[in-house]
Amino acid sequence: MFLKHPAWLWLKKHDKGKLPPVDDALQAMFDDGHEFEKYAEQLFPDATTVGFSFEENNYRTMPVRTKEVIESGAKIILQGRLEAGEITCIFDVIERVGESEYDLYEIKSSTEVKEDHILDLAFQTVVLEKAGLKVRKVFVVHVNNKFERTGDIEVAKLAAQTEVTDQVRAKLEYTKKQIQHALMVAHSPLPPDFSPRHVGLRALDEWMAIYEAMFPQDHPHNIFKLTHLNPQIVGELEDLGVKTIAEIPEGFKLNSKQQRQVTATKADRREVNKENIKDFLAKFEYPLYFFDYETFSAVIPPFDGLHPYQQMPFQYSIHRLDEDGTLTHKEFLHTQNSNPGLPLIKQLVEDIGEKGTVLVWYESFEKGRNEELGLMFPEYAQQMKQLNERIVDLMVPFASGWFVDKDFFGSASIKKVFPVLISEISYKKLHIKEGGTASRVWKETFLEGENTDQRDKIAEDLLAYCGLDTLAMVQLFEFLRTEVS
């Protein structure tokens, strides 16, 4: 928390009400972590669990209970807490390898070791060694993304162990200095600077949610709306006294997308390369199929043939536009607790025909899912390959800078582009407004059996959301065609 932003720690101690509650998306991430943790702990049979919960008495008594388990001679201990002066940590696993000597394991539901894992383990190592334990080796237990489910989950194949002892040891002195700084911040009655320039560990988006709630920005095109923003740029602009994108001086170092955004904002008009867009549209072959998937993923693959976190389509929408202007709609939504792949692919090959351009938004996503479906169901591999050969990315004019509007805020996302150009229809009126919610709600309802009294309504909401994605593409295509005609 402190390493993400010093003021985050200060707020946690002095003004918790300023911190946002855990939302559904973040809770889903926590749930994934807990699910993997339950499997990973099976790698340590006969372990003694101290146990952690947010109940005050449970947390308060953890150090005493942990010491009792250590003194009992337990070889492996799960979910313990130790204190050393003013600092404390909860560890996932320690394994006794000698007299007061232990290996330390951190369980993470990511598919690789990350910088914050090393720093977290360095902090734990400092606490454990100050508390009288010697740490021999340090490991991260993480998800093996090469794992493919076949029958029951084999934990030894699902989880990978990566030793990080040297990386952790290299961070110990840095960590000790940061601990002293953190304690000074925590004890101070005054907060540190709240500026996003002080963000670390790639936590800018997380901190901006807190910062903008505390300090609402009056100008819609303030510097915090610059695309690909990072803390260094924030600091440099603040030092120059720049508060809005239009004030960014000539010669300020920006990438190409940032520069396009700044240019469009200063000009206060759309920049349209009609020739490039006209050439792009001329290559389309009717009928046109506007196509979009909705997918789910899970850290523990629920079906055979799936990898951890593999994006599996459970829904699609297709709007077909004929050359005479006739528009028709096809859709699919899997509502059973079973692998949606085969029923989806069977209907898809019927609905999307064999000829005509297939238009998507961000082609690598749909193409990737089609390749995976072809691998999972080899009898359809050729049809998926042919489908991918027909795909064209309707995002290209916006991502390539052929059509730029300052109100896109440097983004080519359909959620940014569509409301600026087409005002008659809005995602705001839908109960499900973005793909993350669609994925989470489908998984909870149709895979995990929750929301049983709302199944029909949720299915209706999912169909409405996915249907609007492809209708939005139709309308954006029509807009572009009119713009360059």
Predicted regions mapped to residue ranges:
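Acidic, Mg2+-coordinating catalytic module of metal-dependent nucleases/exonucleases
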Residues: 153-222, 234, 417-485
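Conserved RNase H-like, two-metal-ion catalytic cores of nucleic-acid enzymes
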Residues: 82, 276-354, 375
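Conserved DEDDh/DEDDy metal-dependent 3′-5′ exonuclease domain
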Residues: 74-80, 84, 88-92, 104-107, ...
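Residues forming anionic-ligand binding surfaces in small-molecule and nucleic-acid pockets
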Residues: 97-109
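Structured core elements
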Residues: 104, 290, 315-317, 359-360, ...
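Short, amphipathic alpha-helical segments that act as regulatory/interfacial helices
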Residues: 41, 125, 371-374, 474-481
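N-terminal accessory regions of nucleic-acid-interacting proteins
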Residues: 222-288
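Metal-dependent nuclease catalytic cores that hydrolyze phosphodiester bonds in DNA/RNA
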Residues: 1-100, 232-257
